[in-house]
Regions:
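Short, hydrophobic beta-strand segments
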Residues: 18-20, 81-88, 213-226, 307-313, ...
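A short, glycine/Asx- and small/polar-enriched loop/turn
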Residues: 77, 209-213, 267-271, 353-359
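Glycine-rich, mobile lid/loop segments that gate access to catalytic sites or pores
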Residues: 106-247, 251-252, 257-265
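Glycine-rich, N-terminal phosphate-binding loop and its surrounding beta-alpha-beta segment
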Residues: 43, 47-122
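N-terminal, positively charged regions that mediate nucleic acid binding
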Residues: 1-53
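Internal helix-turn-beta structural module
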Residues: 335-399
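Long, well-ordered mid-to-C-terminal structural blocks that present hydrophobic/aromatic surfaces
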Residues: 237-304, 313-336
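N-terminal, Lys/Arg- and Ser/Thr-rich interaction peptides
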Residues: 1-18, 142-156, 210-219, 292-306
């Protein structure tokens, strides 16, 4: 394990920029569907005859290409959007069919019902299960027994992938992420849209200079609920006022925040951000896994970032998923235990034992944190407590 004290906390930089693609953004929908399908398949394997997570990866999900026209108070569906679940997935175990098309379809439909609630499967959106079993490894995706799933007993790093995570969130990151979360009601078992006239394809962008944070939020209104341009502008003004108050509360005096909502919707050549069903997949936009938020729910250009997207990857052995979650857990634990900002970097050579990672780097700010021995012991203890796939079988909507 390597420990260094060379990190400059991002909140100490003169400029900081952070972005979040909301839950209804095409890329975020693709990430979420991929993860939902992977976890549904993993649970089915663990609860069924295999008793272990079988080989699969569905980290190439595609969504988009719909066509809906909209106008004040109405819309017309011309072509449904499509969800294409690309990847590979074990189709049978010991000769018994696992029903993977049903698993893919039902998992995607459940996810869409939460985060794209105005879409109707079979009407405005179509789900195409497309996972194959193509490989040059005999029985890899049609195992006759767990002897054909060697990683079930001896998990090894499936790839040489570097994953990095950070804690805590900076004040800017906190405002940007939580501002989009504020458009949802989190009081139940699953989140629900807070406003019935607001779509889910939201983007929040923050630019901080010194302690001044400018936030731009792009928030779609649903066309069926908008009677006119004047009504649109009035609703946007109300949303802007409400989000400004939420941003001020989130900043808690640490930043001076200015919030704009849909700034292109007034003046000459204005453009309204108005959608029929709440996501730009309805107007030709497309989303694929790995183009959006990192595991922490943000796009942070000024922080090191994992090159692997974890969404849809096998939770039993894929380094790009396991190390991403483990790095974030370690960063959170170090911050919670010692009250210091840190970055955690993890990697292992392909084929080496998955846990613990072969290479661990903990980076702290100069002069901060415990001694190297105490920190090493703590990190090793936390790594030993990490369970695969058990700690990765819950889809976390909120960080």
């Amino acid at each position: 394990m390597h420990i260094s004290r060379t990190m400059t906390p991002v909140q100490d930089l003169p400029v900081e920029t952070v972005e979040r693609k909301g839950f209804g953004h095409p890329d975020t929908l693709a990430d979420g569907i991929a993860e939902a399908v992977s976890l549904a398949f993993s649970r089915a394997c663990l609860d069924g005859a295999p008793g272990a997570v079988l080989h699969h990866n569905v980290d190439k999900v595609y969504i988009g290409a719909g066509h809906i026209t909209r106008r004040y108070g109405a819309h017309e569906l011309l072509k449904p959007a499509v969800v294409r679940i690309n990847g590979r997935m074990s189709a049978s175990f010991a000769g018994e069919d696992l029903g993977i098309e049903r698993i893919q379809t039902e998992a995607a439909e459940r996810y869409l019902s939460v985060f794209a609630p105005h879409y109707r499967v079979g009407e405005s959106i179509v789900i195409e299960p497309n996972a194959t079993q193509h490989t040059n490894r005999p029985d890899w995706f049609t195992p006759k027994s767990l002897d054909d799933v060697p990683d079930a007993k001896d998990p090894r790093a499936s790839d040489t992938a570097l994953c990095v995570a950070h804690a805590p969130a900076s004040p800017t990151e906190h405002v940007v992420r939580e501002l989009e979360y504020a458009l949802w009601d989190w009081s139940g078992d699953t989140p629900r849209p807070r406003f019935c006239d607001v779509g889910q394809d939201v983007k929040v962008f923050g630019w901080r200079e010194g302690r001044t944070l400018d936030v731009t939020a792009c928030v779609p209104l649903l066309s069926d609920s908008v009677a006119s341009h004047d009504a649109y502008q009035e609703r946007i003004r109300h949303l802007e006022s409400e989000l400004q108050g939420i941003a001020d509360t989130l900043a808690d005096g640490r930043l001076d925040v200015r919030t704009r909502v849909n700034p292109t919707t007034s003046g000459e050549g204005y453009r309204e951000y108005m959608l029929a069903l709440g996501s730009c997949i309805e107007c030709g936009e497309e989303g694929v896994v790995g183009r959006g938020n990192a595991l922490n729910g943000l796009i942070n250009p000024l922080r090191p970032r994992s090159m692997e997207s974890p969404f849809g990857k096998n939770p039993a052995y894929h380094t790009g998923k396991v190390y991403g979650h483990l790095a974030q857990q370690l960063a959170d634990d170090v911050h919670a235990r010692f009250g210091v900002a840190c970055s955690v970097w993890l990697t292992s050579p392909n084929g080496f034992p998955l846990l613990p990672p072969r290479n661990v780097w903990i980076e702290l700010a100069p002069g901060e944190g415990p001694g190297d021995r105490e920190l090493t012991d703590f990190v090793q203890e936390r790594m030993a407590a990490f369970q695969v796939p058990g700690d990765l079988l819950v889809q976390r909507f909120r960080r």
